[in-house]
Amino acid sequence: MDVLAEEFGNLTPEQLAAPIPTVEEKWRLLPAFLKVKGLVKQHIDSFNYFINVEIKKIMKANEKVTSDADPMWYLKYLNIYVGLPDVEESFNVTRPVSPHECRLRDMTYSAPITVDIEYTRGSQRIIRNALPIGRMPIMLRSSNCVLTGKTPAEFAKLNECPLDPGGYFIVKGVEKVILIQEQLSKNRIIVEADRKGAVGASVTSSTHEKKSRTNMAVKQGRFYLRHNTLSEDIPIVIIFKAMGVESDQEIVQMIGTEEHVMAAFGPSLEECQKAQIFTQMQALKYIGNKVRRQRMWGGGPKKTKIEEARELLASTILTHVPVKEFNFRAKCIYTAVMVRRVILAQGDNKVDDRDYYGNKRLELAGQLLSLLFEDLFKKFNSEMKKIADQVIPKQRAAQFDVVKHMRQDQITNGMVNAISTGNWSLKRFKMDRQGVTQVLSRLSYISALGMMTRISSQFEKTRKVSGPRSLQPSQWGMLCPSDTPEGEACGLVKNLALMTHITTDMEDGPIVKLASNLGVEDVNLLCGEELSYPNVFLVFLNGNILGVIRDHKKLVNTFRLMRRAGYINEFVSISTNLTDRCVYISSDGGRLCRPYIIVKKQKPAVTNKHMEELAQGYRNFEDFLHESLVEYLDVNEENDCNIALYEHTINKDTTHLEIEPFTLLGVCAGLIPYPHHNQSPRNTYQCAMGKQAMGTIGYNQRNRIDTLMYLLAYPQKPMVKTKTIELIEFEKLPAGQNATVAVMSYSGYDIEDALVLNKASLDRGFGRCLVYKNAKCTLKRYTNQTFDKVMGPMLDAATRKPIWRHEILDADGICSPGEKVENKQVLVNKSMPTVTQIPLEGSNVPQQPQYKDVPITYKGATDSYIEKVMISSNAEDAFLIKMLLRQTRRPEIGDKFSSRHGQKGVCGLIVPQEDMPFCDSGICPDIIMNPHGFPSRMTVGKLIELLAGKAGVLDGRFHYGTAFGGSKVKDVCEDLVRHGYNYLGKDYVTSGITGEPLEAYIYFGPVYYQKLKHMVLDKMHARARGPRAVLTRQPTEGRSRDGGLRLGEMERDCLIGYGASMLLLERLMISSDAFEVDVCGQCGLLGYSGWCHYCKSSCHVSSLRIPYACKLLFQELQSMNIIPRLKLSKYNE
């Protein structure tokens, strides 16, 4: 009851007396949903499905390996399993391994894949169980992971953070995420117009065996089928005849009996007449002549052209429509529907929208890995077949034992390479994708979470097309409208909203049964004419025609009832399309859906009673689904529904109610307080900056050794929270600090969004951060029995103390923790042998191996401290030494800060506290912000955040700034007045310099500020003299190499425009790469040391200064037989 009292404690009597009975607590469905589904659950579900179901299907599809050499020999897979992650300690000794150990030791977190097989050896049949064939990288928190089902205490034992989302892989010690990939949906007819306005239809078919794309094109009013196995387009009527529909009347019946449809199809019939094709055989022969010859490796019996054409029609064109024993009925009707759609679209231009989100499917880690594994498994089997074909004929003495020839590393390396490089190239499917995986960004907790919900669409970033980039209305509630990067990837990289779920594939057997029980007439029993009756609807299941139905409304309503009662899977969707007169049932994976509350008789089905039961733990989210209180809708089904946002907007047509409006936004946008008061681009900027804010990354951050880790010294919870912040537990791992802000102008150092910071706050640790870097080194063994070793420090001859470079080394030659390390000092004094290969026979072998020093040195402008040193070994049995280096940095001028409203600014001035203005309660602001940042940016949310934060501090409680809700400004201001502050949040402020009161009241209060990772120390760069490149003798480039600043083409043009020719000469030659050359005045070629090799004389040689790069160019041109000649003339002639 206390919880309820707190919840209702802040309501006024008027609100309590309001007549509408609202389910106030319905947002509690959210934590229940996230408990079941979670933000990363889609990755994990899909991987679990792959490991437990899909992998067995792949094995079933390729279960037998036979050999042409010996018909008696075979190998058959009986079962396949993926084990638990382990590591091989020594030969054949394995032990379970934790993810953290894999991170530290640079190993892959993977589990063995084992199979049960049955095979023949000689004349006996052998069954072997649990035979390993490779290793599978395991996704963290999946069903095969060590972490699954553990309590927080056990997490701590395993050095894992309980808040870490999981859903990524650890490959060679690096955390890798497989991004969600966005595709056009498979097996669906898409009608579109090309650039010239000609309408065509296309289907991308995909089954386990084949993927292919079939197009329907219109040329001069005639219809053609286009496919890349055919050398030219084939008239559609010939295709129908080849499929066994020989009578023209029947063809017309299938396509449509309406006037305009028959008129449009006429020319195609005439064309077939001209080609003199009437029977199925003639048509097949015609197609057989047009088939592209495929060069097959296997000999195999040659097929006739007619057989080849039949095979092609049955298995390659429209692959996903099944053809049993050459019964082409279903495929005919499918083709007819394609033609019909094109004809109908020509008249009133009803083409499909490629960017409509119901036509999209999202591929998750499980689907991508199953494609990859299938490819590798097929390769593995074909290798075995090759070996069998080679070995069986040879050795008749010994029996051929296939187990000895199984190569385990093939599947392992294939998986590891694909995940670590991100290149998915499968030759079978002509699939070649780059950048499928990315390194999990560990800048902050939010950046890791945001990466798990990211969607990457395979679209060229360089093309400036607005279609795929714009925000589609069909993305409402499924994708976050704010969270997309700026620049070239804008709108192509998207993020999931908070409650989105991505479906996985499910069995469609029960659906087919249910549909036929509800009166769907089977497609094989149709004559075709039914398709054009006005009241007959076609029924599609996952893109295949199931049949037709007369009363489609009854079908749809009964289907939904059955789904709500739990007889069918809750993620199956059914939707009607009135323009095409179709009912679509989908049960395939990769559809986006989200839960809604069902509305019955203008009242939501969920009542306060249900919510109390949920709060007390009697019910979980599943119960809401089974009792038909809540259901999932996908994008297509949302079009049939009428969804109310709030309960007071429910009318008689409403079918569903939104659970909470703020779930429209994703994870990153959910952190913003009052985002509905901000201008839209500001929220987008904050989504990008929230991922760069430093804070905490997990409870195990002190045990990790990452390449680069930024931590805030004193992170704080934000004073103004949102519901999202609580749901994703951001307040346990925050990134930022509550700063007291005065909005006023102070000195001239705060123009252009610069901030003025209080020096005393910095001294007390405001914005102070720790930067951790790592250095690592491996000690290898070499083939000739030599190995790397670590030498002790070198001692000075006179003082017997280590020399300066080795000052921090212990006696074992590795730096000791806690020492301060300066630039160019040695961290590990490693030396490696000069000869690492086995020397050739007969050459004189040096007895004692010679060693050369290859020390690991510290490179960095500022000093660091050694936090810890870890000594271990990696998977290749090499010694592995990792050092963690720490720097503590306080904010300085030029460091970047930002509030949660996309208002970024650099620190412009640090002022001692005695010069800062203060209010009459003696509070000095931490930050002074220029008021000019507000008017043009229109971030009213920031103003409200300051008010709510101030009221919260005075009351000692957190306020909510949730999107489309949150604490009301009126209530917050009344709280301020109650504590004796101004209603408007303004204070009377005294100047710190003159001691007189300022002439205006100052808006003053706490705002949550984030420190971003861009610090001046890492970016500052200048150079006077320094290293030069060897080849061109010009200064190197880049800050890390201490490079110069380039004067480029545009700067050169500018100087030419000013006519400053001597400055040009000085910048481009004298300060860069001036060089003295000798030139022969007679032939114009370069001479060397005063002698022209071409003229064989030194009479005309004179010396000039030209850039070295220019000399290099001349010589490179000469080597290609192009001769540049320098013409010299005396300047006074």
UniProtKB/Swiss-Prot annotation:
One of the Pfam families matching this protein, by short name: RNA_pol_Rpb2_1
Binding-site list for RNA: 186, 213, 438, 692, 896, 904, 1019
Site feature Critical in trapping poly(dT) in Pol III-mediated transcription termination, where: 429
Catalytic activity: RNA(n) + a ribonucleoside 5'-triphosphate = RNA(n+1) + diphosphate
Residues noted as binding Mg(2+) in the record, renumbered to the chain: 753
Effect of residue 426 to S: In CMT1I; affects RNA polymerase III assembly; no effect on nuclear localization
Residues annotated to bind DNA nontemplate strand: 195, 432
Family: Belongs to the RNA polymerase beta chain family.
Protein name as it appears in the record: DNA-directed RNA polymerase III subunit RPC2
The gene coding this protein: POLR3B
